[in-house]
Swiss-Prot record:
Disulfide bonding pattern of the chain: 26-41, 33-46, 40-61
GO annotations of cellular component type: extracellular region; host cell postsynaptic membrane; nematocyst
Comment on protein domains: The presence of a 'disulfide through disulfide knot' structurally defines this protein as a knottin.
Other facts: Negative results: does not show activity on rat TRPV1, human TRPV3, rat TRPA1 channels, the human ghrelin receptor, human neurotensin receptor 1, rat ASIC1a and ASIC3 channels.
The protein, known as: Alpha-actitoxin-Ms11a-1
Principal location class: secreted
Keywords attached to this entry: Acetylcholine receptor inhibiting toxin, Cleavage on pair of basic residues, Disulfide bond, Knottin, Nematocyst, Neurotoxin, Postsynaptic neurotoxin, Secreted, Signal, Toxin
Coiled coil: none
Organism (species): Metridium senile (Brown sea anemone)
Function in brief: Alpha-toxins act on postsynaptic membranes, they bind to the nicotinic acetylcholine receptors (nAChR) and thus inhibit them. This toxin competes with alpha-bungarotoxin for binding to orthosteric sites on muscle-type T.carlifornicus (IC(50)=408 nM) and human alpha-7/CHRNA7 nAChRs (IC(50)=14.16 uM).
């Protein structure tokens, strides 16, 4: 029984190391983000959107350009 619990914990630790965005509650599209942390969901990047009048002030999660 103890080995099964240990196995589940080991799998969880490996998964959280490999897929941090799925466990840490990643930031969705257009959410505020901070540049130094990779907190946007998979396929999103943290950028300052350009709203036509220069650069935006807030960093947001936006779709990464291919």
């Amino acid at each position: 029984m103890a080995s099964k619990i240990f196995f589940v914990l080991a799998v969880f630790l490996v998964m959280s190391a490999v897929l941090p965005e799925s466990f840490a509650g990643c930031k969705k599209l257009n959410s505020n983000c901070s540049r130094q942390y990779r907190e946007c969901c998979h396929g999103l990047v943290c950028r300052r959107p350009n709203y036509g009048n220069g650069r935006g002030i807030l960093w947001r999660c936006v779709k990464a350009k291919k």
